[in-house]
Amino acid sequence: MKSKKILIVGAGFSGAVIGRQLAEKGHQVHIIDQRDHIGGNSYDARDSETNVMVHVYGPHIFHTDNETVWNYVNKHAEMMPYVNRVKATVNGQVFSLPINLHTINQFFSKTCSPDEARALIAEKGDSTIADPQTFEEQALRFIGKELYEAFFKGYTIKQWGMQPSELPASILKRLPVRFNYDDNYFNHKFQGMPKCGYTQMIKSILNHENIKVDLQREFIVEERTHYDHVFYSGPLDAFYGYQYGRLGYRTLDFKKFTYQGDYQGCAVMNYCSVDVPYTRITEHKYFSPWEQHDGSVCYKEYSRACEENDIPYYPIRQMGEMALLEKYLSLAENETNITFVGRLGTYRYLDMDVTIAEALKTAEVYLNSLTENQPMPVFTVSVR
């Protein structure tokens, strides 16, 4: 097979994994990124004052049920055992999340067994809501007014900048309650943290003789003609110069502060009350429990609407955005020799494991398209 010249826009997980897969098959891969570092939003770095490893763009915990993906990251990093145990400050008390038997008993001042807790939550739920349409209705139906208002209402307003009565029920897909004392935030089979950080992991993925990386480099659409194929992991609307307007995202602001000793005793503390302006405080040294640090680095995290010069984090995907997305998809689907990938390229919220799985699949589809002399699709996943 003749070696192809590949341009990849973005040096996060999507771009790095696709690039590595194609480089290993002998293709010449050029990866560019407008930032001054690799890793996208999973970038981490040592704090100069405390030497704590900081998740610069907010907490990233690796969790998956996909064994192929787990094996892949273990090839490029030593994965340390890590369980994400989130706490929440509500009405002057600290509770465990997700809501579990301990949370229920503490909140209602009871000593329920699992079956008693099930009965209690069923009794609290609003059974008159037969077909919940909104986030609020879904929560009231599932868990009732007290737990909803304590743990979900204020936090959701801060996170999304909207009333829960304006958000779709699908955001709260299933009963967010456990009737045991399990306080592991994730249900996945494989969970961990790269011992030397995500930046080092992605550096390992990019370490191949057929990969060239240029940082602080903007993508110029006209450059496409110099390459056989482009994989674009930047924002879909940006690719088209925002000609129909900007797709809606939430962005995050982080207020960093340092502390001597332990600030909060856990990695993540949610603040559920709408009266507290931030959504959570992250204490970064708790993401690396195998290390010892006297000092501590903390982030207060604030969520707001993403504006022109902000970093887009969470795609909103409400009705208005989906109509706008459709316009951009109608442009994209007429393209040739380009594939839109990743969180920004497909306007979907993706965890790291899904991003890697989709990148592996995309590379496979491209290699197969070459073998079979078929056109490469513009999207390798469903984006609607």
UniProtKB/Swiss-Prot annotation:
Positions of disulphide bridges: none
Residue positions binding FAD? S14, D33, Q34, N41, H60, I61, F219, R343, L350, D351, M352, D353, V354, T355
- InterPro entries found in the cross-reference section: UDP-GALP_mutase, UDP-GalPyranose_mutase_C
The UniProt catalytic activity note for this protein reads: UDP-alpha-D-galactose = UDP-alpha-D-galactofuranose
- Any one GO molecular function term: flavin adenine dinucleotide binding
- Class of this enzyme: isomerase
Residues annotated as binding UDP-alpha-D-galactose are: N84, F151, T156, W160, Y185, N270, R280, Y314, Y349
Effect of loss of the gene? Abolishes lipopolysaccharide (LPS) biosynthesis.
What does the UniProt cofactor note say?
Binds 1 FAD per subunit.
Q: Which GO terms describe its cellular component?
A: cytosol
* Keyword presence, Flavoprotein: yes
**Which pathway is recorded for this entry?**
Bacterial outer membrane biogenesis; LPS O-antigen biosynthesis
User: Keyword Flavoprotein: yes or no?
Assistant: yes
Where does the signal peptide begin and end? 1-23
Keywords per UniProt: FAD, Flavoprotein, Isomerase, Lipopolysaccharide biosynthesis, Signal
User: What Enzyme Commission number(s) appear in the record?
Assistant: 5.4.99.9
BP GO terms, sorted: O antigen biosynthetic process
Its cofactor is: FAD
Quaternary structure note: Homodimer.
Database matches in NCBIfam families: UDP-GALP_mutase
Annotated function: Involved in the biosynthesis of the galactose-containing O-side-chain polysaccharide backbone structure of D-galactan I which is a key component of lipopolysaccharide (LPS). Catalyzes the interconversion through a 2-keto intermediate of uridine diphosphogalactopyranose (UDP-GalP) into uridine diphosphogalactofuranose (UDP-GalF) which is the biosynthetic precursor of galactofuranosyl residues.
- Family statement: Belongs to the UDP-galactopyranose/dTDP-fucopyranose mutase family.
Q: What is this protein called?
A: UDP-galactopyranose mutase
Native organism: Klebsiella pneumoniae
Q: Which gene encodes it?
A: rfbD
